[in-house]
Amino acid sequence: MATHGSFEHRFRGLIVLTLIAFLLFESRPAAAWGNEGHTYINRVAAEKIPTSMPLFMRRAVDEIAYLGPEPDRWRSPTEFALKNSQEPDHFIDLERVSWLDPLPAGRYEFYRKLYEKRAATADHPDDYLPERVGLQPYITMEVYGRLKAAFREYRQLRAAHKPTAAVEQAIILYAGWLGHYAGDASQPLHTTIKYNGWVGPNPNGYTTEHKIHWEFEGPYVAANIHATDFAPLVKAPERLNDPFADYIAYLKDSSTQVERVYQLEKAGGFVGQGTPEAFDFTTHRLAAGAQTLLNLWYTAWLESADAMPEHAPPRTAKTKAQAQERSATLAIH
């Protein structure tokens, strides 16, 4: 008969094995920009919200800043289903989809294309699984859609002279949540198979150790960068012509900076106080995240004046003009 001590020994052994398995199979670093970077991106963007947008958002800077790291709070192994489902939301390996241009705007069409590619690939077909490729632009556009829908509801409630406190809370949540992904995409290592150590031909001798990702976005940013360092780089928002296409262009631009991260690491740029070159690079990447976030908020607000709920009657030129007039009125409240 097993004793209590032997059962306890086996139980502890099982816990150790489980933790080892988790560490072995964890494929991606736990966060982008760390808690500080994501908080700073959201704060800087919120402080730049124009007066043409609702006043309650301009008063919610602290709440929006707090929500910057929120999706990283969903990545604990103690909430397995949550962690597992949203792990691919934080990255996209653009090298794996270089054959697919343009990327489809819909998540499920993207899945279909990947599975077709996987079926036709003999060598490492699982590289084309959606969870391996990453789904970063799709979650971003889905949260953007939630924000736009909430803005639309806010407009309708205001026009009907009904309370708006509940939808204001939803808008703040979606705005902060969206900020996380806009920030992720500004970190070049979230766009590449070289996300945590150089892979492939390496004539320049870049690091292959699995630590560059966290050293860059975590301890280095926390110790050396503050929101005020990059806030002046963020300008007034601009309306995006095509949010999805513009966001993909932003991701691709970020991916062009991957080698620069490795060059800076090789030069000791992320050790201790780092180097002036690393500081300049990092502040510009954080500013790019805040600028993109601000542009997304602004575009969602403007588009919500035109967007209609499902089964709504078509909008005429007259009602569209009326909506634009209401938009200017609502912004001051």
Give the location of each predicted region.
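N-terminal secretory signal peptides that target proteins for export/translocation
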Residues: M1-H9
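Intrinsically disordered, low-complexity segments enriched in polar/charged residues with Gly/Pro
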Residues: E8, I20, E168-Q169
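Bacterial N-terminal signal peptides
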Residues: G13-E26
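N-terminal, motif-rich segments that launch catalysis or mediate targeting to/interaction with membranes
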Residues: E26-A175, T191-A287, Q291-H333
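Alpha-helical and His/Cys-centered functional microenvironments
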Residues: E8, G13, N42, S186
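Absolute N-terminal positional cue centered near the fourth residue
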Residues: H4-G5, L19-I20, N35
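Short alpha-helix carrying the canonical HExxH Zn2+-binding catalytic motif
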Residues: I171-A185
